Amino acid sequence: MALVDAYKKVVDFLNNNGYSYFIIGGIAAGTLGEPRVTADVDVDIVINKKDVPDFLGKAAKAGFKVPVKKCLKSVEQVGVFQISFSDYHIDFIIASTDLESQAYKRRKSIQLHGVKAFFPSPEDLILMKIIPGRDKDLLDAKGVIIRHKGKLDIKYLKTWAMKLCDEAQDMRIWQALNKLLKD
């Protein structure tokens, strides 16, 4: 069993059950930017916390390994949860920010590994990668910038970077974006 099988399984599950989602993390970075190794599937999902138990039940019936108590505790504490398929983890981040709300309106359907899945726009993935600020995330953002050079909505990027900086009262995101756009 390979990571691609876990990816296909979760995408089919989400699509067949009508969940609103998009793929993020290393798979999105490799699809929209430069390919890189990743060991899991990361999903941003629109779901009310009260609906997570039903989601977990459906996932278990679909063949995923679901540590229900651990998932529910994690949802309450940090708004994320993890299930698995074979040896691969699938991390779900519950959408909760204005940027995620906007990204859902702009998401794109992309055929990858024989299944259609939703991915954020290149601009939204760049912003989502800059926010944590880890080296690998900044490299992912740079890869997306390089791949979409001349096609990015720079005004959108800068508007959201400034908004995020205002909310955080920290200019790091603005500075990181401008550095990545210049390099």
Q: Which residues fall in each region the model found?
A:
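Compositionally biased terminal segments of proteins
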Residues: 1-183
